[in-house]
Amino acid sequence: MVDRDIRIAVVGAGVAGLTVAALLRDRGVDCRVFERAPRLVAVGAGIQLSPNGVRVLHGLGLRDSLAATGVRARAIETRSWADGAPIARTPLGDRCEELYGAPYYLIHRADLHRCLTSLLPASAVELGRACARVEERPDAVRLHFTDGTMADADLVIGADGVHSVVRRSVVRDAPRYAGYAVHRGLVPASVVPSFRDDPRVMFWLGPGRHVTYYPVAGGRTVHFSAVGVSPEESPGGGPEDLGAAFGHWHEEVRRVVTSASSVTRWGLYDRDIPDRYATGRVVLLGDAAHPTLPYLSQGANQALEDVTTLVGCLDARPGAPQEAVRQYESLRLPRTAEVHRRARRLAEEFHLPDGPECTDRDQRMRATQDPTHLAWLYGRTAGLPDASDLAPRP
């Protein structure tokens, strides 16, 4: 088990930061989370939790909480933008659990955040502590905060997202704008009545754009994201802009994207995969390590894999955190690089113009719609600790 005398500081109270803190504190470790925001507010709306991520959350004791707040997806269904012609349907539901040992959940980010914060005492998360820089010393790491305060730790875990401050002490690079922007919103469940009997993820693919939507909040609300090519990362945009952008799309898509009372617009960023995720006593998790485009819906799920791998490595090397993070790095770099590479490729495939390339893509999707083709992503990965390898939370 992890050395209980080690002091661990986590920067960032997102999915990765809260989860790793919960696992470490379960082991009696002095672990504190430093979050720049003055209060915990979950940014965003829907999250797709695939079995590789759900297994981790089940291992934390959140099985009942996920079942109560999430929506168990029956399928991922892909259709063509204009006429709604079916392209592929990947069955999930019971089949997913049979293959991968956990369901596929659709959940509101705020609900997931509440599940994770319930695992920690309020004193474990220090709010309003914005990290300005990381100073690595021979015997410790010192965090410097923007308010002039400092904190020392034996190990610092950077879980502070795509614009990570902690990452600067490990890798010198910058986020890359991917050339796409996403509009996100929430609409009433009545907008997509078919979700009542067939809760699923809907993908609509078209030239230069795609739309995803699915039920969240126990089926009471539908989350959508509408992605389009955008050469410049400009702010703003509302439902009226979406109505114009998707004016020639299928009626259901138009109804979804124009039914929100408000939408948010975000540029999509990633970074190249570096040659390391750690240096000495500093290690990166989640988007701080490998920010990835969202086309595989793996942001939170890969972060959860990071957490179980890191904690498993710390368990295996008590008293030697630097060796543990080197092992974590060697295990996670190849895996996350493959997910990252495939996500970038899908950025092109999802937005092809109508024509021969689009037809070929649709045929490939039909040929791989059986969920067994997702074993590389959703199944247990050789050499990586999984939730069942970690002591369960009572």
Swiss-Prot record:
Family the UniProt entry places it in: Belongs to the 6-hydroxynicotinate 3-monooxygenase family.
Q: To which pathway does this protein belong?
A: Antibiotic biosynthesis
Please name the gene that encodes this protein.
creL
Q: Where does FAD bind?
A: A16, R109, D287
Tell me which cofactor or cofactors this protein depends on.
FAD
Descriptive protein name: 3-amino-4-hydroxybenzoate 2-monooxygenase
Report a single Gene Ontology molecular function. monooxygenase activity
- Record's function text: Part of a gene cluster involved in the biosynthesis of cremeomycin, a light-sensitive o-diazoquinone with antibacterial and antiproliferative effects. Catalyzes the hydroxylation of 3-amino-4-hydroxybenzoate (3,4-AHBA) to 3-amino-2,4-dihydroxybenzoate (3,2,4-ADHBA).
**What organism, scientifically named, is this protein from?**
Streptomyces cremeus
Superkingdom, taxonomy of origin: Bacteria
Please provide an example of a Pfam family that matches this protein in its UniProt record: FAD_binding_3
Q: Which reaction does it catalyse?
A: 3-amino-4-hydroxybenzoate + NADPH + O2 + H(+) = 3-amino-2,4-dihydroxybenzoate + NADP(+) + H2O
